[in-house]
Amino acid sequence: MTAIESFDNIYLDLSKESGKCRFAETGFGWKPVGGGDTFTLDHNNIASAQWSRAAKGYEIKIVQRSKSGIIQLDGFQQEDYDRLAKVFKNWYSTVLESKEHALRGWNWGKAEFSKSELTFSVQNRPAFELPYSEIGNTNLAGRNEVAVEMALPESGANAQLGGARSKGSKAAAGRDQLVEMRFYIPGVTTRKEAEGEDAGSDAGNDEQEKNAATLFYETLIDKAEIGETAGDTIATFLDVLHLTPRGRFDIDMYEASFRLRGKTYDYKIQYEAIKKFMVLPKPDEVHYMLVMGLDPPLRQGQTRYPFVVMQFKKDEEVTIDLNLNEEELKSKYQDKLEPHYEEPLHQVVAKIFRGLGNRKISSPAKDFITHRNQYGIKCSIKASEGFLYCLEKAFMFVPKPATYIAYEQTQSVTFSRVSGAVSALSTFDITVLLKNGAGSSQFSNISREDLKALESFFKLKGLRVKNEIDEDANLLAAAMNQQMDDSEDEVAAKADRGSADEDEESVDEDFRTDSESDVAEEYDSAHESDGSGSDESNVDDDEQDDDDDDDDDDGEDEDERPKKKKKTG
C-alpha cells in the first residue's frame, strides 16, 4: 500500500464541480478541478464512515467527531471499496460499513434521530438521510404534521458557506432542489422511543407520553440547534402583532439572527437577510408599522413573504435591559446599542434591529403630506385595501400585498379617472410603469384631494408624470362648449322660422264645439248623461234647453236689459 491513495472525479457535498480526493495517514483532502479552496479533514476527526450507493456511483459518508457534521464524497466506483476499506481500517482505525438503501418506494416508515442526521428507514433499511446542517427551519403544520424546511444553497444552518468550506449547507446544489418536506406522525409516544439510543438520561420525562408530532418537532429543534440553542437571547418581545404574515409572534433577538415564534409557525431569520427596514406611521394616528424586506423571503408552505409587517400602538411604552455587558456593547456594536431602553415600543424594537442588523431605518419623505396632514395614502391594489407611502427613494404599499417600487426603476406615473365608477369624480388611480418591460402596478381609489400634492412630489423626484384626468376634463369641456354653440345656432334658426310657422293654420275636422266631454261624465258627480234618470228629469232638461235658446236669442241685448228678478214664493 502506497503512502497516498488518490481518486479522480469525486464530488464533495453535492458540489457541481468534481475534484481530486487524496487519502493519507494524517487525513484526507479534496480540491476542485477548476481551482479553488481545498478541503481537508484530520484523521482524528473521523468518527465513523459508511459506504453506499449514491447519485454518481458510490459514496463515502463520514461523520465528524468535533462538529457532528456529515461529509459526503460521491463518485467512487464499486471496485474502489476494497482499497478504501483498507485505508479506513489501517490509517483511521475505522470500519467502512457498507449499507444498502431501501428501494421499495414506500412513503411510510420509521424516523430515527442519530447524532448527526435524521434517518428515515423502511424495513430497517435507510430510505434517505437528512443531515441536521441541511435543516433551516421546522414548524408544526398541523396536529399530526411536521414541516421541515431545507437550508438554502447560499447559506447553511449558521449562515456560512458550504461546499469545500463544509460549515453549513451543501455546496451549490442544482437549480431544482428540495426546499420542504412534511412528515405525518399520528398517535402518541415517549421521548425515549422517539430518540432511540440517543435519548437523554432523564427517565421521568422519557416515560411521559406526548403527541408524537409535537415530540418529533421538539426533538428536531434540539438536534438541529434551531432556536434558543443558537446563543443567548439579547432581547425578547412577546405577543407582537404581525400583519404579514398574519398572526402574533414572540420575537427573540440573538447576536446573528432573530426568531419569530408563533402558535403554528416559527421562523429563524438572519440579520443579513434584512435588506430594507422602514418605520411607517399609520394614518389612524394610533399605530406604527415596522416593515422589513427580506431576501430570501419567508416561506409558509407554498406562500412566500418577502416583507414582514409588524404593528405597534403609538403610545405603548416599554422598559427593557439588553443581555449585553458594557465591553460587548463597545467592542461589537460600537455604541449602536444602549444597555437600557425606556421608550415607546416601536422605537425600541427599531433601534435594536438597527444596532444588531446594522441596517438603516427609512421613513416617509418630508416633502409629501396628504390633505389630512398624514404620510399614508389610503388606496387599494385590486381588492386589497392598504396604505401607500412615498419614501425618499421608493413607493411602499402595506400591509398586503406588501409592494416596494424604487423610483429609479420607474419609467412613468399616470393619473387616470376611475372608469365607470360612481366615485369617479372623487377618486382616481395611479399606474406605475416599470422600466425594461418589468410590468406595472396600479393603486386605486385615491382621494382626488391628494392629486395635486402627489403630482408635485413626483415632479420633484424627477419622475415622468402623465395626468389623464386633466386631459379628459379639457376634452370634455371642449366637447360641451361645442355642443352649446351648436344648440345656440339651432335655437336661432328656429327663431327665424317661427313667424312663418305660426301663420299656417289647419282645420281640425274632428273638433266639435257642441259635443259634450266624456271627462265630465266620468268625474263630475252632478253630471247626468242622456237617456238616464226619470221622466221629470227629461222635462226639466227640455225646459232648460228652452231657456238656453231664449238666452241665445236675447244675447245681443243682454248688456242693455236689466236683470230679471227671481220669483219667490
From Swiss-Prot:
Gene Ontology cellular component annotations, sorted alphabetically? FACT complex
Any Pfam family from its record, for instance, is SSrecog
Per the record, where are the segments of Acidic residues compositional bias? 537-559
Q: Which domain of life is it from?
A: Eukaryota
Q: Where in the cell is it found?
A: Nucleus; Chromosome
CDD domains in the record: PH1_SSRP1-like (cd13230), PH2_SSRP1-like (cd13231), PH_TFIIH (cd13229)
UniProtKB keywords:
Chromosome, DNA damage, DNA repair, DNA replication, Nucleus, Transcription, Transcription regulation
Q: Where is the composition biased (Basic and acidic residues)?
A: 491-500
What the record says about family reads: Belongs to the SSRP1 family.
**What is known about its subunit structure?**
Forms a stable heterodimer with SPT16. The SPT16-POB3 dimer weakly associates with multiple molecules of NHP6 to form the FACT complex.
The further comment given in this record reads: In contrast to the orthologous protein in animals and plants, this protein does not contain a HMG box DNA-binding domain. This function may instead be provided by the HMG box of the associated NHP6 protein in the FACT complex of fungi.
Function field: Component of the FACT complex, a general chromatin factor that acts to reorganize nucleosomes. The FACT complex is involved in multiple processes that require DNA as a template such as mRNA elongation, DNA replication and DNA repair. During transcription elongation the FACT complex acts as a histone chaperone that both destabilizes and restores nucleosomal structure.
What is this protein's record name?
FACT complex subunit POB3
